[in-house]
């Protein structure tokens, strides 16, 4: 779990997301509170519950991006799910408990990577011995092995082809679920693991070069040095105490008054989410997982439905409300120029691979922002995603002819932008279909 201060978290998010100060502060405080809780005494720690967050705002303003960046910062198990993918128990589809199972799987991957890094030196040493075994055999004299070891470390044998045994990864029987019994693949997986251990584990022979064999063998040797049961225990504890679940599109399962359609299933999903958000125990193949201290961040555009259309019980379990505002022309301008991997920087880098130097004037950036705002207000407000559409239209000709213009420079100014999208943006009816 990272120990960044709220100010540091907001500063890091500022590198990728423009504006939305309230949302950044809310997630920064929530993340810091996870760390604060870990510092408490055992009896008080169990009493401190996370304050779940509901982010409300139009599409394309940064709700999902904030969650993605937060996940990288947190260094904790994190899953992002769309609420619309789940159905009420009894309906065909995934049930909400799968969220927790996915969270534990993410936790296992994180803990395994961390433990692998700790034993990497020893694993590399063991991998080197296995490469030498493949090159000179296990019965070779120490002098021969030392001679080949020197060549190996001097990269003289990198291209030599060898045959090595590596552990079989994945379940050969394949995982499956019995309809109506989520998690029913648990028994199947455990049986295959038990038989695998009883038979000493499955291996397969592969032919590869000495250079390429190292990555496979180091992973293989790392896994031999790790205690799987310990990893599973740590992953479950990490998911329970540090886990973050981002529930996107929650407005799509809100039931509107007087609405018709799949209302029962929508309301059913909300009712299934209640115990998960409040705190329950979910059975996974790694053991029971308590959801009491998992942080839930829900988000939705709420164009049609309102937050008050959610079940009152679910509203009560999302106590922190944050509203994200629509983007202005100045925001679009900053998105194009100030973010860490801005669109302008991306397009410049892409065209540089063809030897084309791309340059944008200040008035071109203003024109791009203006067109994006105009289209969002006249057609449909899709937020910052509109910039991608506009940029693609503007640079269509340059991108297509780039291979023939190697070594040339292209300057995009306001007139160039207006020629390529200005007329189209002005014609609202045409814009609806093209932009």
From Swiss-Prot:
<dbReference type="Pfam" id="PF10431">
    <property type="entry name" value="ClpB_D2-small"/>
</dbReference>
<dbReference type="GO" id="GO:0051603">
    <property type="term" value="P:proteolysis involved in protein catabolic process"/>
</dbReference>
<feature type="binding site">
    <location>
        <position position="313"/>
    </location>
    <ligand>
        <name>ATP</name>
    </ligand>
</feature>
<feature type="binding site">
    <location>
        <position position="248"/>
    </location>
    <ligand>
        <name>ATP</name>
    </ligand>
</feature>
<comment type="function">
    <text>ATPase subunit of a proteasome-like degradation complex; this subunit has chaperone activity. The binding of ATP and its subsequent hydrolysis by HslU are essential for unfolding of protein substrates subsequently hydrolyzed by HslV. HslU recognizes the N-terminal part of its protein substrates and unfolds these before they are guided to HslV for hydrolysis.</text>
</comment>
<keyword id="KW-0963">Cytoplasm</keyword>
<dbReference type="GO" id="GO:0016887">
    <property type="term" value="F:ATP hydrolysis activity"/>
</dbReference>
<dbReference type="GO" id="GO:0008233">
    <property type="term" value="F:peptidase activity"/>
</dbReference>
<protein>
    <recommendedName>
        <fullName>ATP-dependent protease ATPase subunit HslU</fullName>
    </recommendedName>
</protein>
<dbReference type="InterPro" id="IPR027417">
    <property type="entry name" value="P-loop_NTPase"/>
</dbReference>
<dbReference type="InterPro" id="IPR050052">
    <property type="entry name" value="ATP-dep_Clp_protease_ClpX"/>
</dbReference>
<dbReference type="GO" id="GO:0036402">
    <property type="term" value="F:proteasome-activating activity"/>
</dbReference>
<keyword id="KW-0143">Chaperone</keyword>
<dbReference type="GO" id="GO:0009376">
    <property type="term" value="C:HslUV protease complex"/>
</dbReference>
<feature type="binding site">
    <location>
        <position position="18"/>
    </location>
    <ligand>
        <name>ATP</name>
    </ligand>
</feature>
<dbReference type="InterPro" id="IPR004491">
    <property type="entry name" value="HslU"/>
</dbReference>
<dbReference type="InterPro" id="IPR019489">
    <property type="entry name" value="Clp_ATPase_C"/>
</dbReference>
<keyword id="KW-0346">Stress response</keyword>
<feature type="binding site">
    <location>
        <begin position="60"/>
        <end position="65"/>
    </location>
    <ligand>
        <name>ATP</name>
    </ligand>
</feature>
<keyword id="KW-0067">ATP-binding</keyword>
<dbReference type="Pfam" id="PF07724">
    <property type="entry name" value="AAA_2"/>
</dbReference>
<dbReference type="Pfam" id="PF00004">
    <property type="entry name" value="AAA"/>
</dbReference>
<dbReference type="GO" id="GO:0005524">
    <property type="term" value="F:ATP binding"/>
</dbReference>
<dbReference type="GO" id="GO:0043335">
    <property type="term" value="P:protein unfolding"/>
</dbReference>
<comment type="similarity">
    <text>Belongs to the ClpX chaperone family. HslU subfamily.</text>
</comment>
<dbReference type="InterPro" id="IPR003959">
    <property type="entry name" value="ATPase_AAA_core"/>
</dbReference>
<feature type="binding site">
    <location>
        <position position="385"/>
    </location>
    <ligand>
        <name>ATP</name>
    </ligand>
</feature>
<keyword id="KW-0547">Nucleotide-binding</keyword>
<dbReference type="InterPro" id="IPR003593">
    <property type="entry name" value="AAA+_ATPase"/>
</dbReference>
<comment type="subunit">
    <text>A double ring-shaped homohexamer of HslV is capped on each side by a ring-shaped HslU homohexamer. The assembly of the HslU/HslV complex is dependent on binding of ATP.</text>
</comment>
């Amino acid at each position: 779990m990272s120990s960044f201060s709220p100010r540091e978290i907001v500063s890091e998010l500022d590198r990728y997301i423009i504006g939305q100060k309230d949302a950044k502060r809310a997630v920064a405080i929530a993340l810091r509170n996870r760390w604060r809780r870990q510092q408490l005494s055992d009896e008080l720690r169990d009493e401190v519950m996370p304050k779940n967050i509901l982010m409300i705002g139009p599409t394309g303003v940064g709700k999902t991006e904030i969650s993605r960046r937060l996940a990288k910062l947190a260094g904790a198990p994190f899953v992002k799910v769309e609420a619309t993918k789940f159905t009420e128990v009894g309906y065909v589809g995934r049930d909400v408990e799968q969220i927790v199972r996915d969270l534990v799987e993410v936790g296992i991957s994180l803990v395994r990577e961390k433990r692998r890094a700790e034993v990497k030196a020893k694993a590399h040493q063991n991998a080197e011995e296995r490469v030498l075994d493949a090159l000179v055999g296990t019965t070779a004299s120490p002098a021969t092995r030392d001679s080949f070891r020197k060549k190996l470390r001097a990269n003289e044998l990198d291209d030599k082809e060898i045959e090595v045994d590596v552990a079989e990864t994945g379940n050969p029987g394949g995982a499956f679920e019995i309809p109506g019994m989520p998690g029913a693949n648990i028994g199947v997986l455990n049986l295959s693991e038990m038989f695998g251990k009883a038979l000493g584990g499955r291996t397969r022979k592969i032919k590869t070069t000495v250079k390429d064999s190292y990555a496979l063998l180091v992973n293989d040797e790392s896994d031999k040095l790790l205690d799987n049961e310990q990893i599973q225990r740590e992953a479950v504890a990490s998911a329970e105490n540090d886990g973050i679940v981002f529930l996107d599109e929650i407005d799509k399962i809100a039931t509107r008054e007087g609405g018709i359609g799949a209302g029962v299933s929508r309301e059913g999903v909300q009712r299934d989410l209640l115990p998960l958000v409040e705190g329950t125990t979910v059975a996974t193949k790694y053991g029971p997982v308590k959801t009491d201290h998992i942080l839930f961040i829900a988000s939705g555009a709420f164009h049609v439905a309102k937050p008050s259309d959610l079940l009152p019980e679910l509203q009560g379990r999302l106590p922190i409300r944050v509203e994200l505002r629509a983007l202005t022309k100045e925001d679009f301008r900053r998105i194009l120029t100030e973010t860490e991997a801005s669109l302008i920087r991306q397009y410049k880098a892409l065209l540089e691979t063809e030897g084309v130097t791309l340059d944008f004037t200040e008035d071109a950036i203003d024109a791009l922002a203006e067109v994006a705002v105009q289209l969002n207000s006249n057609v449909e407000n899709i937020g910052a995603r509109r910039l991608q559409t506009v940029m693609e239209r503007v640079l269509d000709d340059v991108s297509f002819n780039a291979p023939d213009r190697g070594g040339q420079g292209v300057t995009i100014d306001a007139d160039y932008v207006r020629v390529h999208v200005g007329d189209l943006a002005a014609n609202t009816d045409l814009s609806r279909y093209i932009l």
